Amino acid sequence: MYYVGIDISKRVVDVCLLADGIKGKRKTKTLPNGPNAVQALAEWLTRQKCEPSQAHIIMEATGVYHEHLAYGLHQSGIAVSVINPHRLREFARGMGILTKTDKVDAYVLACYGCLRQPE
């Protein structure tokens, strides 16, 4: 199982793929957030040698911005977990990560998935 953290904003989606757990390689990508985001993400995962069916996507609830992507990924057969932002921030603090940027948030989301393995 590959854990993929996604930080979503109005215009872009920051993605972090953990290939070998939190200590292993991490790959990142910024994709446009729009109608083709699901397809673009699936294609990028495939190029990283991660079949979408082997991925577990972790994202935080961000008002309306996460909904289209979460539903689209779920309909494509990809496992998706939507996490409460407050819970994620406390998790990051517990890891000693106090910086708050989109790329760091994507990494923290991937770590959360890897360590907590949400349903």
Residue ranges and their predicted role:
Residues M1-E119:
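Phosphate- and other anionic-substrate recognition elements at nucleic-acid/protein interfaces
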